Curated annotation (Swiss-Prot):
Heme b b566 binds at H97, H196. InterPro entries: Cyt_b/b6_C, Cyt_b/b6_C_sf, Cyt_b/b6_N, Cytb/b6-like_sf, Cytochrome_b, Cytochrome_b_C_euk/bac, Cytochrome_b_N_euk/bac, Di-haem_cyt_TM. GO terms for cellular component: mitochondrial inner membrane; respiratory chain complex III. The keyword Signal does not apply. This is Cytochrome b. The keyword Mitochondrion applies.
Length: 379
């Protein structure tokens, strides 16, 4: 008799994806982030579900309902902070996952990569809408500033913004629809993640060398299940350290003040994981130009396969490209720092230089370096 996990229609799918899946024998810990993102998503859906049981999406009661969750609901405080800091862990894993893909040339799996970029946009949209829900000062003003950017779109901009708001300003209608979308999006993300995995399993995983590993595969279970469990334990450890010892470390104190349309906070800024894009937006003095740069800063990932001119897939054996990659990583950290600073000298010029560097490295320097390295191969 055949093993049930190989014959049962449902078990067979799970078996081929997580148990008997042939995996390269040499994938490093940088390949752990896919499973960590899955864990993050499950954690966010579960904590979010329990928060939604007590949250009210009305401007008059939203702030108080979050306070009620933290004060009166059994373990409400831990659920709330696990959800808020879980988002931070989600983005850390996301950026590491994308960085891994860029470093090792995983973007040559076109379908997987493109679905991944769509996933990144969806997760960013979900996180933005979630940040609006507690209805604190930064929630309200963040929503106002970011949605207002759409008014830069010629001709239809203003109508589009008012359509999204459901009125002439961010108000009850906006909060209610953001809650509805914030609830449904994680399930769309889960579906997209399955498609992402489906496309990945069409080709099999990449590996650090970027060379085909077809002749040297090992079963996913037990080797990579054990390896993934280590990653999961480290993820949960980091998350719980944040939640239990410094729950507000990554948040904004302004969000503990209820939303007030009459008082603008001195420094409007998004959560830390959007600061790099916010810095790029602010570095361009023109509104439409800033919005375009903001969108392109993420959309540029779609161009990665087109910009790949190297004869080698991975950066493992390309020291010059490695150097550029880590300069890009440092540049993103610089942009993240600048995004949280006030708009004054010297931060303005640093932000502008870092923004130019970001696009220059990806669009010009990386392909140029790859061509130089191609010439090295002839020696």
């Amino acid at each position: 008799m055949t093993n049930i996990r190989k014959s049962h229609p449902l078990m067979k799918i799970v078996n081929n994806a997580f148990i008997d899946l042939p995996a390269p024998s040499n994938i490093s810990s940088w390949w752990n982030f896919g499973s960590l993102l899955g864990i993050c998503l499950i954690l966010q859906i579960l904590t979010g579900l329990f928060l939604a049981m007590h949250y009210t999406s009305d401007t008059t009661t939203a702030f108080s309902s979050v306070t009620h969750i933290c004060r009166d609901v059994n373990y409400g405080w831990i659920i709330r902070y696990m959800h808020a800091n879980g988002a931070s862990m989600f983005f850390i894993c996301l950026y590491m996952h994308v960085g891994r893909g860029m470093y090792y040339g995983s973007y040559t799996f076109l379908e997987t990569w493109n679905i991944g970029v769509i996933l990144l946009f969806t997760v960013m949209a979900t996180a933005f809408m979630g940040y609006v829900l507690p209805w604190g000062q930064m929630s309200f003003w963040g929503a106002t500033v970011i949605t207002n950017l759409l008014s830069a779109i010629p001709y239809i901009g203003t109508s589009l913004v008012e359509w999204i708001w459901g009125g002439f300003s961010v108000d009850k209608a906006t909060l209610t629809r953001f809650f509805a979308f914030h609830f449904i999006f994680p399930f769309i993300i889960a579906a997209l993640a399955m498609v992402h995995l489906l496309f990945l399993h069409e080709t099999g995983s990449n590996n650090p060398t970027g060379i085909s590993s077809d002749m040297d595969k090992i079963p996913f279970h037990p080797y990579y299940t054990i390896k993934d469990i280590l990653g999961v334990l480290l993820l949960i450890l980091t998350l719980m350290l944040l939640v239990l010892f410094a729950p507000d470390l990554l948040g904004d104190p302004d969000n503990y003040t209820p939303a007030n349309p009459l008082i603008t906070p001195p420094h409007i800024k998004p959560e830390w994981y959007f600061l790099f894009a916010y810095a790029i937006l602010r570095s361009i003095p023109n509104k439409l130009g800033g919005v375009l740069a903001l969108v392109l800063s993420i959309l540029i990932l779609i161009l990665m396969p087109l910009l790949h001119v190297s004869k080698q897939r991975s950066m493992m054996f390309r020291p010059l490209s490695q150097c550029l990659f880590w300069i890009l990583a440092a540049d993103l950290l610089t942009l993240t720092w600048i995004g949280g600073q006030p708009v004054e000298h010297p931060y303005i010029i640093i932000g502008q230089l870092a923004s130019i560097m970001y696009f220059l490295i990806i669009l010009v320097l990386m392909p140029a370096t790859s061509m130089i390295e191609n010439n090295f191969l002839k020696w």
